[in-house]
Amino acid sequence: MGSAMVLSMSLLGFLPYAVFGPAIGVLVDRHDRKKIMIGADLIIAAAGSVLTIVAFYMELPVWMVMIVLFIRSIGTAFHTPALNAVTPLLVPEEQLTKCAGYSQSLQSISYIVSPAVAALLYSVWELNAIIAIDVLGAVIASITVLIVRIPKLGDRVQSLDPNFIREMQEGMAVLRQNKGLFALLLVGTLYMFVYMPINALFPLISMDYFNGTPVHISITEISFASGMLIGGLLLGLFGNYQKRILLITASIFMMGISLTISGLLPQSGFFIFVVCSAIMGLSVPFYSGVQTALFQEKIKPEYLGRVFSLTGSIMSLAMPIGL
């Protein structure tokens, strides 16, 4: 598969969020977020089911894979802000940072385990069976959300402005009213703009610069995910720390120092590069987890869908620009 095709498929993974995010945020705030999450998971499951059936009879055409990636991205664009918006309705305010830390730890476990499990399954099962597992996961997620009682916003949703465009603009207006959160959004955008190109080069650095093999790439990725796991657990354990802006500052500093050291390493410095990757992973929860918790605490629940969709959209736009 050519690099242009790989890039196209990567763009399909997050461009829908970047383009449609602000409009999706309005829908998330207008309607029952529980139903939105269930619907998003079922859409992802349906798209995966189509691939499963087609893969059973023929080799999957690239255009179909790209369409399914687009549909999955739309589903994620609904699910992610809805999930972030309902979290403060379920978790006490003083526990939001801890919750974000543990959530990032679970995510990092999937980064560590998924490649190994995927390689094992691919060696013993057909592709359609592997895709079916993904479909099953989406169905299980829908059932899980269905049985969880999520408080509704009630009258606050009904009081939303009927003007769709004005509601979209309210997301930015709410952010601009809180100068600290707006500054944090700008920092996050710059963070994505700088880090994403470097992250995309990690496999190339491992293979070409350090004269490595695919095993070296795996070691680097596992190191990053392991650091992220430890960072998430630490944030979960000590999430009540009050000076959270200090945590974000320390996270950016750790990331910057690690990237600088990585850029100065000789070709014999792969081990140090692995250590730097672990430190980078360690720093991530103290930025993204704390940022999410701050938004959840400072923004009223009826605006959270629009705010999280808007921030996700802006950061998603920063990714291709940085690349």
Swiss-Prot record:
How does the record classify its membrane topology? Multi-pass membrane protein
The record, for InterPro entries, names: Drug_antiport (IPR004751), MFS (IPR011701), MFS_dom (IPR020846), MFS_trans_sf (IPR036259)
Key word DNA-binding present = no
Question: PROSITE patterns, from UniProt?
Answer: MFS
Q: Where is this protein chiefly located?
A: membrane
- Gene Ontology biological process terms from the UniProt entry: response to antibiotic
Q: Which domain of life is it from?
A: Bacteria
Q: Note the CDD domains from the entry.
A: MFS_MefA_like
Name of the protein in its database record = Macrolide efflux protein A
Q: Which organism is it from?
A: Enterococcus faecalis (Streptococcus faecalis)
Q: What is the lineage of its organism?
A: Bacteria, Bacillati, Bacillota, Bacilli, Lactobacillales
Q: Which gene encodes it?
A: mefA
